Amino acid sequence: RSCEICHNLGKDCEGYSTECDSPEDQCGMVLLEVSPAPISFRTVHRNCFSSSLCKLEQFDVNLGHDAYFRGRIHCCEEEKCEVNSFPGLPFSQLNGYSCPGVLGLFSEDSSEHEALCRGTETKCIEIVGYRKERFPGDIAYNIKGCTSSCPVLRLSNRTHEANRNDLIKVACTDASKTTPSE
Protein backbone atom coordinates (compact mmCIF):
# COMPACT_ATOMS: atom_id res chain seq x y z
CA ARG A 1 0.00 0.00 0.00
CA SER A 2 1.16 3.54 -0.80
CA CYS A 3 0.39 6.38 1.64
CA GLU A 4 1.03 10.12 1.71
CA ILE A 5 3.66 11.33 4.20
CA CYS A 6 3.57 14.95 5.39
CA HIS A 7 3.64 17.16 8.48
CA ASN A 8 2.49 20.77 8.78
CA LEU A 9 1.02 23.46 11.00
CA GLY A 10 -2.71 23.96 10.55
CA LYS A 11 -5.32 21.52 9.24
CA ASP A 12 -3.76 20.07 6.08
CA CYS A 13 -0.45 19.17 4.46
CA GLU A 14 0.96 18.04 1.14
CA GLY A 15 3.85 15.62 0.89
CA TYR A 16 5.03 12.59 -1.00
CA SER A 17 3.83 9.01 -1.34
CA THR A 18 5.73 6.02 -0.02
CA GLU A 19 5.14 2.29 0.21
CA CYS A 20 4.17 1.10 3.68
CA ASP A 21 5.25 -2.22 5.18
CA SER A 22 3.49 -4.48 7.67
CA PRO A 23 2.48 -3.90 10.42
CA GLU A 24 2.20 -0.20 9.45
CA ASP A 25 0.10 -0.96 6.40
CA GLN A 26 -2.75 1.52 6.76
CA CYS A 27 -2.81 5.13 5.61
CA GLY A 28 -3.64 7.55 8.38
CA MET A 29 -3.94 11.15 9.44
CA VAL A 30 -3.43 12.63 12.91
CA LEU A 31 -4.63 16.08 13.94
CA LEU A 32 -3.03 17.43 17.12
CA GLU A 33 -4.28 20.48 18.97
CA VAL A 34 -2.96 22.36 21.96
CA SER A 35 -5.70 24.62 23.29
CA PRO A 36 -4.60 26.93 26.04
CA ALA A 37 -7.49 29.36 26.36
CA PRO A 38 -8.10 31.55 24.38
CA ILE A 39 -5.82 30.40 21.49
CA SER A 40 -5.20 27.04 19.85
CA PHE A 41 -2.30 25.57 17.93
CA ARG A 42 -2.89 22.74 15.44
CA THR A 43 -0.65 20.39 13.48
CA VAL A 44 -1.45 17.69 10.94
CA HIS A 45 0.51 14.50 10.23
CA ARG A 46 -0.13 11.96 7.45
CA ASN A 47 1.78 8.67 7.54
CA CYS A 48 1.68 4.87 7.52
CA PHE A 49 0.08 3.52 10.71
CA SER A 50 -0.57 0.18 12.36
CA SER A 51 -4.11 -0.99 13.09
CA SER A 52 -3.43 -0.65 16.85
CA LEU A 53 -2.74 3.08 16.43
CA CYS A 54 -5.78 3.43 14.19
CA LYS A 55 -7.97 1.92 16.92
CA LEU A 56 -6.94 4.68 19.34
CA GLU A 57 -9.05 7.15 17.29
CA GLN A 58 -8.81 10.03 19.76
CA PHE A 59 -7.27 11.25 23.00
CA ASP A 60 -7.79 14.28 25.22
CA VAL A 61 -5.38 15.37 27.96
CA ASN A 62 -6.51 18.06 30.42
CA LEU A 63 -3.32 20.02 31.17
CA GLY A 64 -4.96 22.25 33.79
CA HIS A 65 -5.54 26.01 33.64
CA ASP A 66 -8.20 25.49 30.91
CA ALA A 67 -5.66 23.98 28.51
CA TYR A 68 -5.99 20.71 26.57
CA PHE A 69 -3.74 18.56 24.37
CA ARG A 70 -5.95 16.61 21.97
CA GLY A 71 -5.50 14.23 19.08
CA ARG A 72 -7.76 12.75 16.44
CA ILE A 73 -6.61 9.75 14.38
CA HIS A 74 -8.30 8.55 11.22
CA CYS A 75 -7.15 5.63 9.07
CA CYS A 76 -8.49 4.76 5.65
CA GLU A 77 -8.02 2.69 2.51
CA GLU A 78 -7.13 5.72 0.38
CA GLU A 79 -3.65 7.23 0.06
CA LYS A 80 -4.80 10.57 1.53
CA CYS A 81 -7.10 10.21 4.55
CA GLU A 82 -9.37 12.96 5.76
CA VAL A 83 -10.31 13.51 9.39
CA ASN A 84 -13.11 15.44 11.02
CA SER A 85 -12.19 18.62 12.81
CA PHE A 86 -12.23 18.87 16.58
CA PRO A 87 -15.50 19.25 18.44
CA GLY A 88 -15.73 21.96 21.06
CA LEU A 89 -13.69 21.58 24.22
CA PRO A 90 -15.24 19.34 26.87
CA PHE A 91 -16.36 21.67 29.64
CA SER A 92 -17.67 19.09 32.10
CA GLN A 93 -17.80 19.48 35.87
CA LEU A 94 -14.82 19.01 38.17
CA ASN A 95 -14.85 15.45 39.54
CA GLY A 96 -12.69 15.76 42.66
CA TYR A 97 -9.53 14.23 41.14
CA SER A 98 -6.26 15.90 40.21
CA CYS A 99 -2.98 15.17 38.43
CA PRO A 100 0.29 16.98 37.82
CA GLY A 101 -0.23 19.20 34.80
CA VAL A 102 2.37 20.52 32.39
CA LEU A 103 2.85 21.33 28.74
CA GLY A 104 6.56 21.68 28.15
CA LEU A 105 7.67 22.27 24.60
CA PHE A 106 11.40 22.64 23.87
CA SER A 107 12.21 21.25 27.33
CA GLU A 108 11.76 17.88 29.04
CA ASP A 109 11.99 19.66 32.42
CA SER A 110 9.04 21.98 32.99
CA SER A 111 7.41 23.37 36.09
CA GLU A 112 4.29 21.50 37.13
CA HIS A 113 0.98 22.78 38.41
CA GLU A 114 -2.14 21.01 39.59
CA ALA A 115 -4.55 19.93 36.86
CA LEU A 116 -8.09 19.56 38.20
CA CYS A 117 -9.75 16.63 36.44
CA ARG A 118 -13.22 16.88 34.89
CA GLY A 119 -15.98 14.45 33.94
CA THR A 120 -14.61 10.94 33.32
CA GLU A 121 -10.93 11.92 33.73
CA THR A 122 -9.57 9.67 36.49
CA LYS A 123 -6.11 8.83 35.11
CA CYS A 124 -2.87 10.82 35.04
CA ILE A 125 -0.73 10.56 31.92
CA GLU A 126 2.88 11.61 31.38
CA ILE A 127 4.62 11.64 27.99
CA VAL A 128 8.23 12.83 27.69
CA GLY A 129 10.36 12.70 24.56
CA TYR A 130 12.01 14.40 21.62
CA ARG A 131 10.79 15.06 18.09
CA LYS A 132 13.65 15.16 15.59
CA GLU A 133 13.24 17.94 13.07
CA ARG A 134 15.56 19.18 10.36
CA PHE A 135 14.96 22.77 11.45
CA PRO A 136 15.39 24.14 14.12
CA GLY A 137 16.61 20.81 15.51
CA ASP A 138 15.24 18.38 18.06
CA ILE A 139 12.14 19.56 19.92
CA ALA A 140 11.73 18.25 23.46
CA TYR A 141 8.24 17.79 24.90
CA ASN A 142 6.85 17.04 28.34
CA ILE A 143 3.09 16.51 28.62
CA LYS A 144 1.27 15.71 31.87
CA GLY A 145 -2.39 15.91 32.77
CA CYS A 146 -5.74 14.23 33.39
CA THR A 147 -7.21 11.78 30.89
CA SER A 148 -10.13 9.34 30.72
CA SER A 149 -8.09 6.34 29.58
CA CYS A 150 -4.47 5.53 28.93
CA PRO A 151 -3.52 4.57 25.39
CA VAL A 152 -0.68 2.17 24.69
CA LEU A 153 1.95 4.38 23.06
CA ARG A 154 4.70 2.67 21.11
CA LEU A 155 6.68 3.73 18.09
CA SER A 156 7.62 0.95 15.73
CA ASN A 157 11.08 0.90 14.19
CA ARG A 158 9.47 0.28 10.81
CA THR A 159 7.67 3.61 10.53
CA HIS A 160 9.05 6.98 9.65
CA GLU A 161 7.79 8.20 13.03
CA ALA A 162 10.17 5.92 14.93
CA ASN A 163 13.02 7.77 13.26
CA ARG A 164 11.53 11.16 14.14
CA ASN A 165 10.48 10.55 17.74
CA ASP A 166 12.29 9.38 20.83
CA LEU A 167 9.86 8.47 23.61
CA ILE A 168 11.74 8.70 26.90
CA LYS A 169 8.83 8.07 29.24
CA VAL A 170 5.18 7.09 28.93
CA ALA A 171 3.43 6.59 32.27
CA CYS A 172 -0.17 6.27 33.36
CA THR A 173 -1.33 6.27 36.98
CA ASP A 174 -4.56 6.72 38.91
CA ALA A 175 -5.46 10.33 39.63
CA SER A 176 -5.37 11.59 43.23
CA LYS A 177 -8.59 12.34 45.05
CA THR A 178 -8.49 15.99 46.06
CA THR A 179 -9.65 17.12 49.45
CA PRO A 180 -12.10 20.00 49.41
CA SER A 181 -10.60 23.22 50.71
CA GLU A 182 -12.19 24.64 53.83
UniProtKB/Swiss-Prot annotation:
Self-association state and partner proteins as the record states: Heterodimer of subunit A and subunit B.
GO cellular component assignments: extracellular region
Taxonomic lineage: Eukaryota, Metazoa, Chordata, Craniata, Vertebrata
Domain of life: Eukaryota
Protein purpose: Phospholipase A2 (PA2) inhibitor. Inhibits the enzymatic activity of PA2 of Deinagkistrodon acutus. Also shows a wide anti-hemorrhage activities to D.acutus, Naja atra and Agkistrodon halys venom. The native protein is more potent than the recombinant one.
InterPro entries, sorted: CNF-like_PLA2_Inhibitor, LY6_UPA_recep-like, PLipase_A2-inh_b-type, PLipase_A2_inh_N, Snake_toxin-like_sf
Sites carrying sugar chains: 157
Keywords of this entry: Disulfide bond, Glycoprotein, Hydrolase, Phospholipase A2 inhibitor, Secreted
Name of the protein in question: Phospholipase A2 inhibitor gamma subunit A2
GO MF terms held by the record: hydrolase activity; phospholipase A2 inhibitor activity
Family: Belongs to the CNF-like-inhibitor family.
